């Protein structure tokens, strides 16, 4: 999806690679495993530093869980990179996966098809965090603050590049103006 819109994407596997990028996507998967790997390979403090100094960050599904301030579950301990509280697997198990049409603030045109697979939900948003999409019953499924974006669905599964284009804009802003990112929750070291 990223190459489709002209992004020269790399897989970040070493902490030193963070210095080469203006934006990072933490994808779906298993949030506990993602946090364990980020911790084991000493990404956590470096990632916080990069986000605090303006790097764009996007957490999708499990990535949203990873970057949240707080979870309804005791594990994993999230990284506190955006001031939201999240409930894991809100819509149920794998068999309960579904698709929905969403109107996303900042995305023009028709509603965007969103794929929810064991998806989390945003329960609360902190000061300055903007809810940019919700389900028909009002559940927040996409939020943004500064250059940090979090979505509970998998936009990479639909072929629609509009949300990726929005993220590209955030990464370009980071490249052009790497000032402090206004996205982070309180004190990240408190997690």
Where are these regions (language model features)?
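Hydrophobic anchor at the start of a short beta-strand
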Residues: 9-10, 57, 148
């Amino acid at each position: 999806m990223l190459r489709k819109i002209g992004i020269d994407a790399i897989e970040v596997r070493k902490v030193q690679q963070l210095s080469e990028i203006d934006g990072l996507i933490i994808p779906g998967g298993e949030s506990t495993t993602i946090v364990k790997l980020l911790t084991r390979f000493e990404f956590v403090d470096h990632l916080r530093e990069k986000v605090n100094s303006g790097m764009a960050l996007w957490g999708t599904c499990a990535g949203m869980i990873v970057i949240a301030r707080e979870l309804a579950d005791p594990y994993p301990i999230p990284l506190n990179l955006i001031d939201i509280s999240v409930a894991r697997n809100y819509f149920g198990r794998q068999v309960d996966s579904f698709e929905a049409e969403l109107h996303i603030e900042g995305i023009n045109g028709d509603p965007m098809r969103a794929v929810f697979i064991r998806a989390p939900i945003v329960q609360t948003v902190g000061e300055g965090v903007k809810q940019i999409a919700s389900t028909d019953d009002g559940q927040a499924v996409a939020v943004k603050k500064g250059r940090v974006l979090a979505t509970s669905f998998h936009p990479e599964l639909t072929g629609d590049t509009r949300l990726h284009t929005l993220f590209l804009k955030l990464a370009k802003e980071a490249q052009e103006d790497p000032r402090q990112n206004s996205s982070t929750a309180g004190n990240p070291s408190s997690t």
